[in-house]
A protein has these predicted regions:
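Active-site-adjacent substructure of cysteine-protease-like catalytic cores
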Residues: 63-89, 120-173, 180, 392
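Well-ordered beta-strand positions in beta-sheet-rich domains
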Residues: 17, 163, 188-190
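Noncatalytic regulatory segments and standalone regulatory/sensor domains
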Residues: 13, 171-315
């Protein structure tokens, strides 16, 4: 039975749908949509952020080996200092995708070029069917124009590069099974062989930064160079195919990584994990406690102007606290003050997220109320992470066998 559910409601004659994801009861079974479907096991992950990291966590959770990796990470949120200027502007800190074996030792990665796949297999369909037979998931860039579920009913389509996980196929019905964010919800969907080939072949013939994902500020002349730099990085992304497979390594908690990320959170720095992207954009990003300050500025500005609030950072904050609770349970932390603050932070972050969902519909005046809650939450977050850092240093880092 699927523990996730869809909540439907209406306001002033307009219907809305919210997909609610519950943690902790992912099934390890292979779901069978039809008898002719061949697929790798996969489930909706606890945290649905950027498609690559959602895919990684979904693979680990469906094989029941995710908890150690989950609590070792998801500790350092970051955001662009110019919120919403690009679709990917807020997330948790991870290492480079190409070096996943370093920061997620449970998975192996093989990187193939599209030229190699064309030469070796001819058809991408044949290539991905072969990879699936080897128990390897394929992470690819594709043109979402050809995927129906990516768009709302009646929405104008345009070429748009996105990323998905290829995890199954059905020769009888003639479709591939992929996982991605479809209409704002991370899930699996089917795409016909014909449309899959079109989406695969035209992945880079797209508008890389579509106007619908930008704020008005992004059109200012002062941001032209900034956006051009990001667009150049985006154009270069996606030619390679990443093949992910589970290995035989045992799950382990990385206490040093956790400690380093807590220190970065407290200091608003990025010294534990290095990536080319963060080096190139280091003056444009905020981390940890500074992330919370930056998001407050964004929140206050949106409410003052009564504009739509992007909920991504508040989802990240809510999941930050959700994972913190899991972390406390696995580490068997019994500091009652810490646990009480953690529960309060999770409650605050959930309340803020759901209140802002309603605000985007009603545009009601909640500015003072929400900002007060957000400020209280920020204070709690700093206290919780500082205490976690102290606990890690006192109880775990002193033991070299861990």
């Amino acid at each position: 039975m699927d523990d996730n559910f869809t909540l439907q409601f209406s306001y002033k004659g307009i219907s809305f749908q919210v997909y609610v994801i519950l943690f902790g009861k992912n099934s390890n079974k292979q779901f069978t949509d039809s008898r002719s479907l061949t697929r790798l096991p996969f489930c909706i992950p606890t945290v649905c952020n950027y498609p690559f990291f959602a895919a990684v966590l979904g693979i680990l959770e469906t094989h029941n080996c995710a908890k150690e990796w989950l609590i070792s990470n998801y500790l350092l949120p970051w955001c662009h200092k110019e919120p919403c200027v690009v679709p990917y502007w807020v997330d948790f800190r991870f290492g480079e995708e190409e070096k996943i074996s370093e920061w997620c030792p449970l998975l192996n990665i093989d990187i193939l070029s599209r030229d190699f796949i064309k030469k070796e297999y001819g058809s991408p369909i044949d290539a991905f069917k072969h990879f699936i037979s080897q128990n390897r998931y394929a992470y690819i860039s594709y043109n979402a124009y050809y995927v129906d579920d990516f768009w709302s009913k009646g929405e104008h389509r345009y070429p748009y590069k996105h990323q998905c996980l290829v995890l199954g196929y059905d020769d009888k019905q003639g479709h591939m099974l992929i996982a991605d964010f479809f209409n704002g919800i991370y899930k699996t969907t089917k795409i016909s062989y014909e449309n899959f080939i079109l989406a695969y072949d035209t992945y880079n013939q797209t508008n890389n930064i579509p106007q619908k994902n930008l704020t008005d500020e992004a059109n200012d002349q002062s941001k032209t160079e900034y956006l051009n730099n990001l667009e150049t990085l985006e154009l270069e992304y996606g030619h390679e195919i990443k093949l992910l497979s589970l290995n035989q390594n045992s799950p382990k908690i990385d206490y040093m990584l956790m400690y380093g990320l807590t220190q970065d959170f407290i200091n608003g720095t990025d010294t534990t994990i290095y990536t080319e992207y963060s080096i190139n954009m280091q003056d444009k990003l905020s981390f940890g406690f500074e992330f919370f300050i930056e998001i407050r500025k964004y929140l206050q500005k949106c409410m003052a102007e009564k504009t739509h609030i992007n909920l991504k950072p508040f989802y990240i904050i809510q999941k930050f606290n959700h994972v913190m609770k899991i972390r406390a349970e696995i580490l068997q932390i019994n500091n009652q003050h810490f646990l009480a603050e953690m529960d309060e932070a999770l409650k605050y972050s959930s309340t803020i997220l759901y209140t802002l969902m309603k605000y985007n519909i009603k545009k009601n005046d909640i500015q003072m109320k929400i900002l007060e809650k957000y400020d209280s939450l920020t204070t709690l977050e700093f206290s919780i992470v500082k205490e976690l850092s102290n606990i890690l240093e006192a109880c775990y880092l002193q033991n070299p066998s861990l």
